[in-house]
């Protein structure tokens, strides 16, 4: 059977989703989880784009040992140099070069002739091969390119040393039949193409990213580029979990193998969703909350008698736990650590100790601590204090049917400094956010506000996700608490801390650029 390699671009293309801004710690955690999932290649970022991206790619390359780490690069020497400096410490450094090949891109964006584009691509591949043992070359907007020109430039970059040829559907335009025909055309019209790997990269603008990727595999592709949960700019990218499970369940049809550890899929999906703030729809294939739910009486009866009547994917295949341990106030540190590890999370002794304190605080208020509660606590403890410019000290919100909602907030910042503000609003959350805006003394546009319960019951934790815009920065935040208003405040403060972190990084980049 052919082996299909999975090239994960969650940390590069996926992070281009509107409002998604991952910090270094979060990127490293996702990279470690992708390694546990056993993807073949992790595209960690675009090293030349910023100092922050460079550092993230460098640290991921030095951390990940069992899969290849790559970075994106334009066809210019300065980008290639930056990528090598970031990636040279990796276990298997490789470069992902690209240049546009469609008439619309060459004329309006690059302002280059086809001959100039070929020359730039060939020169970039030759230069990159001085450093990188593996060079992947991508024809941006390949699916709107003229096929004879596409074949010509692919032949030239193969001669120059490219070992992987990627054919991206950059704008999600192509149909499955047409996409497969492009791969066949190249195999029939490009000399020595049998000596390289063909790769697919599909966007979901017309809802066909996954089926296009599968069509490419049917027609000769041996690598597929995708993201966890299908996140990405505009309508997103092909969803890794859907392609992977389709290839597994229908191995009889596709006749291919992968090295993926499918039992890590659900955990990876949860991690990416929590850290990016991009919620997985309940009806999402493979990883949605309802993916294994049966409401129809006929379906329920069938599944109880024989699971395969209506269930083609077992929850256990993708890592949905079949058992749920309930912890309580009498549970000790050992039981907590055991369940954390059972759920697939790795925490240091210090992190376990901090988590145990939060666990005990919650157990005093809530009789049973479920897996969902525990995961929420892990995320809050491990990721939500990455760079706390401001911390919530206290909130007080007054609300009554015939009263104007009023909020009082105290924030801590720096070394022992405090801010206290009060404001009103037409509702409790409105009053709370007006007060926080006063604390930060800047105009904040709230783009999205979502709340969901963690588990069920009256004492369930509340989890709030917000998306904000401050000046030209758009980012998200999250907060968890038993009280809805406290969770709302934490989410807003978390988002603002991200804003200040991004602005500080930009200022540092500008300082480096002018020095």
From Swiss-Prot:
Biological processes, Gene Ontology terms: L-leucine biosynthetic process
Pfam family, one: LeuA_dimer
Catalytic activity annotation: 3-methyl-2-oxobutanoate + acetyl-CoA + H2O = (2S)-2-isopropylmalate + CoA + H(+)
Location in the cell: Cytoplasm
CDD domains assigned: DRE_TIM_IPMS
Any one GO cellular component localisation term in the record: cytoplasm
Protein keywords: Amino-acid biosynthesis, Branched-chain amino acid biosynthesis, Cytoplasm, Leucine biosynthesis, Manganese, Metal-binding, Transferase
Binding annotation for Mn(2+): 13, 201, 203, 237
Metabolic or biological pathway: Amino-acid biosynthesis; L-leucine biosynthesis; L-leucine from 3-methyl-2-oxobutanoate: step 1/4
SUPFAM superfamilies, sorted: 2-isopropylmalate synthase LeuA, allosteric (dimerisation) domain, Aldolase
Segments of this protein annotated with the region Regulatory domain: 391-515
GO molecular function, one term: manganese ion binding
Keyword Amino-acid biosynthesis found: yes
Residue span, Pyruvate carboxyltransferase domain: 4-266
First-listed, main subcellular location of the protein, grouped into a coarse class: cytoplasm
EC nos: 2.3.3.13
Family that this chain belongs to: Belongs to the alpha-IPM synthase/homocitrate synthase family. LeuA type 1 subfamily.
Subunit organization: Homodimer.
Known function: Catalyzes the condensation of the acetyl group of acetyl-CoA with 3-methyl-2-oxobutanoate (2-ketoisovalerate) to form 3-carboxy-3-hydroxy-4-methylpentanoate (2-isopropylmalate).
Name the record gives this protein: 2-isopropylmalate synthase
Organism lineage: Bacteria, Bacillati, Bacillota, Bacilli, Bacillales
Gene (UniProt): leuA
